[in-house]
């Protein structure tokens, strides 16, 4: 298939097929590996996997040697150790096409915590390929010391958690958290916070209503007690004095006083 075969240059002569297979692990299914002395070929089932391998593995170390990875071409290129091969499978896609293509996003997302600031997204992606096929990786965005890795399958995600959680990258042990679980935790926390706030609001409202009803009942009882005290209060002294004076000036008392004064005047006349 056109575009599925890649060339490995500057290959260590001691490299075996297992070493090459391990080197390309996580980049898709491999159909064939053909090793020569100092170079070799790897054929993928999907040309997109070949593009990923060329873009991301060129210049990496394989068996203590920095190898060159590029698409297999029909014409020979001398002067750089590749003039001895010719391949009938030629790549029609330029090498820079993959850089402009958007990454494949999936729901099989891992959150990487405690990530060293020296680790780039490329380093993180290369590290996570030990567990499976990585489709997307990012580092320190939007949060520093935190990365995101997405896998092609959920099985690769679980494999990464089991094998790579707690491993060191640049001197720091990383912690892997499944993205869906972390999202659900944040949702549950926000829901509990809203519930507690609504409960506190309802409690404060009920308390204010109770205090308001109590104050109203107290004011009503006070007004009732005042009205009762006013109705039961004794007659003031002035009114009592007025009543006594009016009683002393009754007609019977006036007649008695007149009769007494007459009897006194008669006794005085008889004495004279």
Curated annotation (Swiss-Prot):
GO function term, MF aspect, one: RNA binding
Ranges of biased composition (kind: Basic residues): 74-83, 182-229
Keyword Acetylation: yes
Region (Disordered): 73-105, 174-272
Sites of Phosphoserine modification: 86, 227, 229, 233, 250, 253
InterPro entries tied to this protein: Nucleotide-bd_a/b_plait_sf, RBD_domain_sf, RRM_dom, RRT5_SRSF_SR
One GO term describing the cellular component: cytosol
SMART domains the record matches: RRM
Positions bearing N6-acetyllysine: 167
Low complexity compositional bias, start-end: 242-254
Domain RRM positions: 4-74, 108-181
Keyword Methyltransferase recorded: no
Stretch forming the signal peptide: none
Chief place of localization: nucleus
Post-translational modification, as annotated: Extensively phosphorylated on serine residues in the RS domain.
A Pfam cross-reference name: RRM_1
CDD domains on file: RRM1_SRSF5, RRM2_SRSF5
Similarity comment: Belongs to the splicing factor SR family.
Function: Plays a role in constitutive splicing and can modulate the selection of alternative splice sites.
Protein name (Swiss-Prot/TrEMBL): Serine/arginine-rich splicing factor 5
Organism the protein comes from: Homo sapiens
């Amino acid at each position: 298939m056109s575009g599925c075969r890649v060339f490995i240059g500057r290959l260590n002569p001691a490299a075996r097929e297992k070493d090459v297979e391990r080197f390309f692990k996580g980049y898709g299914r491999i159909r064939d590996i053909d090793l020569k002395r100092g170079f070799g070929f790897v054929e993928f089932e999907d040309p997109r996997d070949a593009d990923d391998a060329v873009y991301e593995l060129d210049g990496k170390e394989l068996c203590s040697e920095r190898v060159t990875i590029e698409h297999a071409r029909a014409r020979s290129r001398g002067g750089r150790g590749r003039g001895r091969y010719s391949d009938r499978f030629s790549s029609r896609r330029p090498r820079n096409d993959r850089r402009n293509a958007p990454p494949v996003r999936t729901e099989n997302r891992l959150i990487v915590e405690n990530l060293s600031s020296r680790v780039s997204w490329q380093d993180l992606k290369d590290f996570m390929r030990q567990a499976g096929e990585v489709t997307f990786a990012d580092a320190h965005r939007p949060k520093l010391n935190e990365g995101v890795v997405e896998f092609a399958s959920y099985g690769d995600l679980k494999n990464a958690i089991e094998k790579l959680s707690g491993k060191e990258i640049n001197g720091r042990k990383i912690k892997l958290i499944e993205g869906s679980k972390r999202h659900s935790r944040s949702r549950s926390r926000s829901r509990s916070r809203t519930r507690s706030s609504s409960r506190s609001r309802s409690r404060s409202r009920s308390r204010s209503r109770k205090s308001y009803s109590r104050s109203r009942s107290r004011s009503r009882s006070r007004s009732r007690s005042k009205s009762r005290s006013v109705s039961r209060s004794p007659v003031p002294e002035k009114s009592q004095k007025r009543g006594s004076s009016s009683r002393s000036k009754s007609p019977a008392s006036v007649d008695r006083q007149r009769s007494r004064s007459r009897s006194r005047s008669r006794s005085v006349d008889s004495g004279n």
